[in-house]
Amino acid sequence: MSKEDEVSRIEANVEVIQGYLLSQFKGFELIDREDPPISYTFTVSKSPDERYLLKVSWTQLSDRTNTPEKTKQCLITDDVAGRMKGRSQGEYFWWKKNL
């Protein structure tokens, strides 16, 4: 596995997650931040009082068996947006899925 392949896979999976979050949190601003090799964080916010946070492990994003299609399906199946909304404001939802 080349470094370029890993970077491309991570970017593709991040784009899928961004699209999912923007579709589930209409009217919200999305900010994401990478923290390699640990995690990638996503913050969707409408105001300081309405903010939802998501963390995804770096290994989950880079795993070669984790295609963008699989990521999209798992986001829906795992109801990631609903679970993010179920957290207290300012508390991250750490999304881990079985690959």
Which residues does each predicted region cover?
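Short glycine-rich, low-complexity/disordered patches
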Residues: L22-I38, A81-L99
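Intrinsically disordered, low-complexity regulatory segments enriched in Ser/Thr/Pro
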Residues: P48-Q89
